[in-house]
Amino acid sequence: MARITVEDCQKRIDNRFLLVQMAIKRVQQYREGYEPLVDSKNKEVVTALREIAAGKVMPEDLALYRPAEGEEMPVAE
């Protein structure tokens, strides 16, 4: 299984501080009962980073998100 790194996540979220805040918030959501959005048997933090790297978790301010090559920018609801 491939290792997930902060650099993988920074392809989508450029700001390291925002990235950490997003991962923390996602871990808190798991502990409240939310289900992971990706298949992972890793610890909560690694699962959160995998979700961010996969583009499954977005920052509240979509202007801070960079879509992957060939991916369209998500629309705020």
Curated annotation (Swiss-Prot):
Q: Does the keyword Transferase apply?
A: yes
The UniProt entry, under InterPro entries, shows:
DNA-dir_RNA_pol_omega, Pol_omega/Rpo6/RPB6, RPB6/omega-like_sf
Enumerate the SUPFAM superfamilies for this protein.
Answer: RPB6/omega subunit-like
Q: Which NCBIfam families does the UniProt entry name for this protein?
A: rpoZ
Name the residues that span the membrane: none
Q: What class of enzyme is it?
A: transferase
Q: Name one Pfam family in it.
A: RNA_pol_Rpb6
Recorded GO molecular functions are: DNA binding; DNA-directed RNA polymerase activity
Say which species the protein is native to. Answer: Nitratidesulfovibrio vulgaris (strain ATCC 29579 / DSM 644 / CCUG 34227 / NCIMB 8303 / VKM B-1760 / Hildenborough)
Which GO biological process annotations does it have?
Answer: DNA-templated transcription
Membership in a protein family: Belongs to the RNA polymerase subunit omega family.
Q: Which GO terms describe its cellular component?
A: DNA-directed RNA polymerase complex
EC nos: 2.7.7.6
Instruction: Provide the assembly information.
Output: The RNAP catalytic core consists of 2 alpha, 1 beta, 1 beta' and 1 omega subunit. When a sigma factor is associated with the core the holoenzyme is formed, which can initiate transcription.
Q: What does this protein do?
A: Promotes RNA polymerase assembly. Latches the N- and C-terminal regions of the beta' subunit thereby facilitating its interaction with the beta and alpha subunits.
Identify the SMART domains for this entry.
RNA_pol_Rpb6 (SM01409)
Which superkingdom?
Answer: Bacteria
- Protein name in the entry: DNA-directed RNA polymerase subunit omega
**Would the keyword Signal be found if you checked this record's keyword annotation?**
no
Reaction catalyzed = RNA(n) + a ribonucleoside 5'-triphosphate = RNA(n+1) + diphosphate
Keywords on record:
DNA-directed RNA polymerase, Nucleotidyltransferase, Transcription, Transferase
